[in-house]
Amino acid sequence: MPLPKISTAEYELTLPSNGKTIKYRPFLVREEKILILALESENQKQITTAVRQVIKECVLTKGIKVDQLPSFDIEYLFLNIRGKSVGESIELMVTCGDDGKTEVPVTVLIDDIEVSNDDEHSSDIELSDGYSVKMKYPSLNQFIETNFSQDDEDAVEKSFEMIATSIDMVYNDKDMFAASECTKKELKEWVESLTSAQFQKIEQFFETMPKLTHTLEVVNPNTKKKNTIVLEGLTDFFA
């Protein structure tokens, strides 16, 4: 006689990028094992890959393509899944900024972690000669490829590639050039042809795009000085 299946609770949350409500469940023991092994590796690429795999299993709403979600949706979704699975708080060690070495333990409640939005953030960026570029958010795959390279030179190259593949279109009052009709090589060459000032405008899109964030204050036990700590992005919450 087979063992009975125990039902799993279902929850809802709203995706920050589009306001869509989705259903999800906590992760199971087999999925927790995947995460533990990734965390023990201390390899950020393995951590993010594990997050992707677990989210695919835990998202119950049909039609949600995890690989196409913006990275900040992925991060927010994972934190909430984790909260319903193993606890509503995260234990971290943070480094005090006043001396750059003293570590202090802190507890962060998952409900206190928000996706911050910058008022100056825009996906439409004016360049020159009447041309503008419309950007799209990097997918999780692009996010992994760009952020978790161990080779500094390779990281620079992948950063350019992520910027190029995040272009949606280039346009002016009369014409529109869709990035989907261009090769990766053509897009990279176009990015490399920009002036430094134009490139900085595009970089601003990534610097101001929504991100997981939480600000806390700690006191350095050695210097007695108060420190403001800002946590940003998924990996900061597994430091």
Regions found by a protein language model. Give the residues of each.
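Long C-terminal interaction/binding lobes of large macromolecular proteins
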Residues: 1-239
